[in-house]
Regions:
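Flexible glycine-rich active-site/ligand-binding loops centered on an Asp-His dyad
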Residues: 101-104, 109-113, 117-120, 162-191, ...
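Catalytic-pocket segment enriched in acidic/His residues
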Residues: 47-54, 61-73, 86, 90, ...
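A generic local secondary-structure boundary/capping motif
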Residues: 1, 70-72, 105-108, 132-141, ...
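Short, structured patches in soluble enzyme cores that scaffold and shape functional sites
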Residues: 120-122, 129, 136, 143-147, ...
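Hydrophobic alpha-helical segments and helix pairs
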Residues: 96-146
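Residue-level recognition of short, solvent-exposed, well-ordered loop/turn junctions
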Residues: 75, 82, 127, 142, ...
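N-terminal non-catalytic cap/leader segment that marks the start of a structured domain
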Residues: 1-106, 111, 207, 215
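Short acidic-glycine loop/turn motifs at beta-strand connectors
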Residues: 7-8, 12-18, 151-153, 218-220, ...
């Protein structure tokens, strides 16, 4: 199943080049009162609601996917977790570019274990149609193409062997960053600097996430191209490690690291990202208001 949010927070299932409006499923979500529970209620209830969503999609008129504005498929993540320098060639390029690297001495980029995971503010999350807004045009804003995974149920201290059982699905992720000397989370949490989309492919449909080709172009120029098999720390280990530091909640997002080829974007650019077995999304770059 391919779950999306589109236009004015409508919910859809994507089938081929069309989507089917299943927004009525919101009536089946549990009623909540203040204080609102953390996490995304639709993602938490997805397995229970899935049969009815499929039935609603069967009855809905198809809408061309190209005609809608895609939001992030996850509306309410409690947190976005990032994995740094998770491709060896990206670490090598960071060693050569002081604006990318966070050094620990001897002029080398620190390893994942040395740096630890990092947190992006959930308020930075947008969908591809909303685009990226460059807030500091005098500084370098870089693209980082990544596989994003969405947690489907509460997870704490899970083993690597069981980790994938906690994944609701996968999406294309874009981890934007302003280069500089400030803390990484500070520079990666700017409004619109976390893009997720164009939809979430459920874990059962995508299958094994450890061998997916992906790429990113800017204005048609190839910038990044790699495969998830080249991750330094694989996905089960990332989930397990994160769950030993934080309780993972339904809707939480892990951006699993980027490959080599990161580079600057400017207002007016168009980024296009493709992931095997997920799809393609275009993300415009604009100047911030």
């Amino acid at each position: 199943m391919r779950l999306c949010r589109f236009n004015d927070n409508r919910i859809g299932l994507v089938r081929g080049t069309n989507l089917h409006d299943v927004t009525a499923i919101r009536d089946d979500l549990p009623a909540v009162r203040y204080p609102l529970p953390a996490g995304d209620p639709l993602i938490e209830q997805l397995q229970r609601l899935r049969p009815k969503m499929e039935k609603l999609a069967d009855q809905a008129k198809p809408i061309p996917a190209a005609s809608v504005n895609f939001l992030s498929p996850v509306a309410n993540p409690s947190k976005i977790i990032g994995t740094p320098v998770n491709y060896q060639k990206h670490r090598e390029e960071a060693d050569k570019d002081a604006q990318i690297a966070v050094y620990s001495g001897a002029n080398r980029a620190r390893t994942i274990e040395e740096q630890g995971l990092f947190i992006k503010a959930s308020s930075c999350l947008v969908g591809p149609s909303q685009g990226v807004s460059v807030h500091f045009p005098d500084r370098r804003t870089d693209h980082e193409a990544e596989l994003g995974l969405v947690i489907g149920k509460r997870a704490r201290n899970v083993s690597e062997a069981a980790a994938l059982q906690y994944v609701a699905g996968y999406a294309i992720a874009l981890d934007m960053v302003v280069r500089g000397t400030e803390d990484r989370s500070f520079r990666k949490s700017i409004d619109s600097y976390g893009v997720l989309g164009p939809w979430m492919v459920t874990a059962d449909e995508l299958g094994d996430p450890s061998n997916l080709d992906f790429s990113l172009t800017v204005n048609g120029e190839l910038r990044q191209a790699s495969n998830t098999r080249l991750m330094v720390m694989n996905i089960p280990k990332q989930i397990s490690w994160a769950s030993h530091w934080y309780e993972l909640l339904p809707g939480d997002i892990i951006m699993t690291g980027t490959c080599e080829g990161v580079g600057r974007v400017m207002p007016g650019d168009i980024m296009a990202l493709e992931f095997e077995r997920i799809g393609r999304m275009e993300v415009p770059v604009r100047a911030a208001d």
